[in-house]
UniProtKB/Swiss-Prot annotation:
Effect in UniProt of substituting I452V: Found in a renal cell carcinoma case; somatic mutation
Protein name: Leucine-rich repeat transmembrane protein FLRT3
Residue ranges, compositional bias (Basic and acidic residues): 389-401
Subcellular location: Cell membrane; Presynaptic cell membrane; Endoplasmic reticulum membrane; Cell junction, Focal adhesion
Residues in Fibronectin type-III domain copies: 409-504
């Protein structure tokens, strides 16, 4: 009795436990009706949702909620109870604040393409295990990031803030960050403290900002000892940055800036660098030995720069020829002087560098105010046409000296013709200047009609190349300082000199353009050689045709009279063509006579008959009928062959 009661008690206990566990199992396996659930992956994307649906299974690990219309009010508070969720995709929604109520253990959060404006400590502190944060294409600004917002994000490795409204790099970023993307913002300055302590940073992308050389702090990248990739594409740099971390840097991208010079120490100690890209800049020469420390370089890309292949670039030719096969260098193509335009620097002979040329120097003195120091925003100056080194070309320039009133500042200017349409202007300043205005005008043209061209050059520059001028034409070049130090000039009257471009006939380039350069059309004011040759051939052809026609017309009537039969053998088909009618006989031609042999059954006579040829040699008719009224059944062709079946001797 006791055992039976005990059995009933155990069965009741099991039933009770089953009833308690059953709802939990059903809940764990439930899925929102608007979503699709598959082994921890919850697919609620692209459904025009305005809020996150309830009833998400507790064993969910990844939530796909992108491409909806979810706003901040649509994030339920019970979402934070999903403790197994590690990845949430909420991009392309309608969030305007950093979302709260997120699962505590989320590691990867995608919030791109929303309208998030603020990042607070309260929102980030609730997800302390976050490793990847994607905030691209939002409205985050530097002032909208709360100070210390990331102080508890000790696991954050990737922070993407591309295409926002940042003007500076946010302070207080966690030391654990390995990749930081800040491209396409409005960053114009980077101070050293903003990147201080980011010793784990490996990849830094700053493309498409407003950075210039004055906006980069001294040694701003120097302490990033683990940095392997630095990208500064599409900024306003005029010189390559210096003091780069040399321990681990492997990739450096500087293309699409306004770089016109490379400091001699720019790439010092970058022994691990294997890819360097400086394409689409304004480089015309490189300081000697600039690549000496690049022991591991394998890809050097320098396309679309106005390289001036003068004496200062001869060392580059020697360096290129000494490189091993594994090193791939692209874009070192001469753009000037004209005689080597389109040629690869590596292929130039030593004589083409003109290392013995000398220039002609003109001196200009101007009066300026008391110097102080004011630096305008760099990067706002227009990109120069082409900057060239001090390559000298004798016999192409004239001395022009203009002297102003006595002053405390002297500018020494060199003006010389480089090609028939290019002049090179260089200058030296005794005292620092912030900016100068450079202009040029073809003499004989009125400035009122827009023929004058001017540009602003920074005080850091010392030379300028003016292109697209007219050959053998006089030009007036003027220069005036816009600012010296902190005070404006009392007198901004420009000081001008006159120069002259070289004649076109002095340049006759015979080079072949490289594949990467567009071939220029051949320009020649004279009649093209091909047209002359074609015309001559046409005239000769017409003359020959006329001569042939005249000859045929003259000799056509004599053709039949001059024809004579060959003494050789003729095929039987030739007789048919000549009008000969064949009988039951075989004609056998023997030299100048032929023999007729009957093929009848009668015995052949032993007597040999010889029939002489009746064909007259001159092709005239042999038979004449003096009686026109009498008819005849025989008639002769013009060739003397009778139409009858028998020949007559």
């Amino acid at each position: 009795m006791i055992s039976a009661a005990w059995s009933i008690f155990l069965i009741g206990t099991k039933i009770g436990l089953f009833l308690q566990v059953a709802p939990l199992s059903v809940m764990a396996k439930s899925c929102p009706s608007v979503c699709r659930c598959d082994a921890g992956f919850i697919y609620c994307n692209d459904r025009f949702l305005t809020s996150i649906p309830t009833g998400i299974p507790e064993d969910a690990t990844t939530l796909y909620l992108q491409n909806n219309q979810i706003n901040n009010a649509g994030i339920p508070s019970d979402l934070k109870n999903l403790l197994k969720v590690e990845r949430i995709y909420l991009y392309h929604n309608s969030l305007d604040e950093f979302p709260t109520n997120l699962p505590k253990y989320v590691k990867e959060l995608h919030l791109q393409e929303n309208n998030i404006r603020t990042i607070t400590y309260d929102s980030l502190s609730k997800i302390p295990y976050l490793e990847e944060l994607h905030l691209d294409d939002n409205s985050v600004s530097a002032v909208s990031i709360e100070e210390g917002a990331f102080r508890d994000s000790n696991y954050l490795r990737l922070l993407f803030l591309s295409r926002n409204h940042l003007s500076t790099i946010p302070w207080g970023l966690p030391r654990t960050i390995e990749e930081l993307r800040l491209d396409d913002n409005r960053i114009s300055t980077i101070s050293s403290p903003s990147l201080q302590g980011l010793t784990s940073l490996k990849r830094l992308v700053l493309d498409g900002n407003l950075l210039n050389n004055h906006g980069l702090g001294d040694k701003v990248f120097f302490n990033l000892v683990n940095l392997t990739e630095l990208s500064l594409v599409r900024n306003s740099l005029t010189a390559a940055p210096v003091n780069l971390p040399g321990t681990n840097l492997r990739k450096l991208y500087l293309q699409d800036n306004h770089i016109n010079r490379v400091p001699p120490n720019a790439f010092s100690y970058l022994r691990q660098l294997y890819r360097l890209d400086m394409s689409n800049n304004n480089l015309s020469n490189l300081p000697q030995g600039i690549f000496d420390d690049l022991d591991n370089i394998t890809q050097l890309i320098l396309r679309n720069n106005p390289w001036y292949c003068g004496c200062k670039m001869k060392w580059v030719r020697d360096w290129l020829q000494s490189l091993p096969v594994k090193v791939n260098v692209r874009g070192l193509m001469c753009q000037a002087p004209e005689k080597v335009r389109g040629m690869a620097i590596k292929d130039l002979n030593a004589e083409l560098f003109d290392c013995k040329d000398s220039g002609i120097v003109s001196t200009i003195q101007i009066t300026t105010a008391i110097p102080n120091t004011v630096y305008p925003a760099q990067g706002q100056w227009p990109a120069p046409v082409t900057k060239q080194p001090d390559i000298k070309n004798p016999k192409l320039t004239k001395d022009h000296q203009t002297t102003g009133s006595p002053s405390r500042k002297t500018i020494t200017i060199t003006v010389k013709s480089v090609t028939s349409d290019t002049i090179h202007i260089s200058w030296k300043l005794a005292l620092p200047m912030t900016a100068l205005r450079l202009s040029w005008l073809k003499l004989g043209h009125s400035p009122a009609f827009g023929s004058i061209t001017e540009t602003i050059v920074t005080g850091e520059r010392s030379e300028y190349l003016v292109t697209a001028l007219e050959p053998d034409s006089p030009y007036k070049v003027c220069m005036v300082p816009m600012e010296t130090s902190n005070l404006y000039l009392f007198d901004e009257t420009p000081v001008c000199i006159e120069t002259e471009t070289a004649p076109l006939r002095m340049y006759n380039p015979t080079t072949t353009l490289n594949r990467e350069q567009e071939k220029e059309p051949y320009k020649n004011p004279n009649l093209p050689l091909a047209a002359i040759i074609g015309g001559a051939v046409a005239l000769v052809t017409i003359a020959l045709l006329a001569l042939v026609c005249w000859y045929v017309h003259r000799n056509g009537s004599l053709f039949s009279r001059n024809c004579a039969y060959s003494k050789g053998r003729r095929r039987k088909d030739d007789y048919a063509e000549a009008g000969t009618k064949k009988d039951n006989s075989i004609l056998e031609i023997r030299e100048t006579s032929f023999q007729m042999l009957p093929i009848s059954n009668e015995p052949i006579s032993k007597e040999e008959f010889v029939i002489h040829t009746i064909f007259p040699p001159n092709g005239m008719n042999l038979y004449k009928n003096n009686h026109s009224e009498s008819s005849s059944n025989r008639s002769y062709r013009d060739s003397g062959i009778p139409d009858s079946d028998h020949s007559h001797s």
